[in-house]
Amino acid sequence: MYNKWYPQNKNELNKVLNEDMLEIPKIKNGKIKEIHGIIVPHAGYEFSGTITGKAFSLLKNKKINKSVVLGPSHYIGFYGLMILEKIETPLGKIKIIGDYEGFETLKKLEYEHSLDNQIPFLQKINPKIEVLPLVVGEVSDTDAEEIAKKLLENKDTLFIFSTDLSHFLPYEQAVKTDRQTIKIIENLDFKRIREIDACGRFPLMIMMHLCRLKDWKPKLIEYKNSGDITGDKSSVVGYGSWVF
């Protein structure tokens, strides 16, 4: 299934991806010697593509053959994890990792844009990349920790966590709300993660455990909201990207 959130013409999609990944950002709080994962939004590329692209631009010269992508479910409610059964973009089909240890028996889901929107960027990094696309339903803190431990049993993997930030708030209120969310994410604040206004709070719970177990620290790359992009500040959606 092709995605309505980005261009469906291969040449046009490549052009947009090249533009979105053109700028390699400087990390505000120091250099990252080794990149283990990123946190990125999943809105339409015209809204959040540059924020996502800056995170992926840091991976341009990295050798990445395998990635786990985790994003929230927008279309059905469930507990735990599901896996996308197939992924195809205008740039080609993606090989789904079927033998990723600890995740072999998950139920399959046909589509989820929070994952699918990341795939063209990954294909620009490595057209032959293999992906484990995990849709995250509701999870407890204990289960989030167990999922993180299982993920870490598989070596040489890039982790991608997908979330947008606040939804449909006036501009100033959104900025204030998102600043708090940014602090919670960067401080790996388990106690407050359920409070945040972000659709990917459950994937972020897993991210926090992953980072705590490995002593990784998320560092903000860029924050904007849709009001910065469209000029309409009456009701906006927040977007941020991080690297760890």
Residue spans of the language-model regions?
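Active-site histidine-anchored catalytic micro-motif
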Residues: M1-T230
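Long, Lys/Arg- and hydrophobic-enriched amphipathic alpha-helices
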Residues: K224-F244
